[in-house]
Amino acid sequence: MKVRASVRKICEDCRLIRRRGRLMVICSNPKHKQRQG
């Protein structure tokens, strides 16, 4: 899980979702998991 100020899609499988008021990226590739900090 990468914590970043700006999250963006890295590949086609990446999905932007909002969880508990935070923007997150979920993907089939675990390296692409991100959360806005």
Curated annotation (Swiss-Prot):
PROSITE patterns: RIBOSOMAL_L36. It holds the Pfam family Ribosomal_L36. GO terms for molecular function: structural constituent of ribosome. It is found in: Plastid, Chloroplast. Its main location: plastid. Keywords: Chloroplast, Plastid, Ribonucleoprotein, Ribosomal protein. One of its GO terms (cellular component) is ribosome. GO terms for biological process: translation. Belongs to the bacterial ribosomal protein bL36 family. PANTHER family: 50S RIBOSOMAL PROTEIN L36, CHLOROPLASTIC (PTHR42888), LARGE RIBOSOMAL SUBUNIT PROTEIN BL36C (PTHR42888:SF1). This is Large ribosomal subunit protein bL36c. It comes from Chlorokybus atmophyticus.
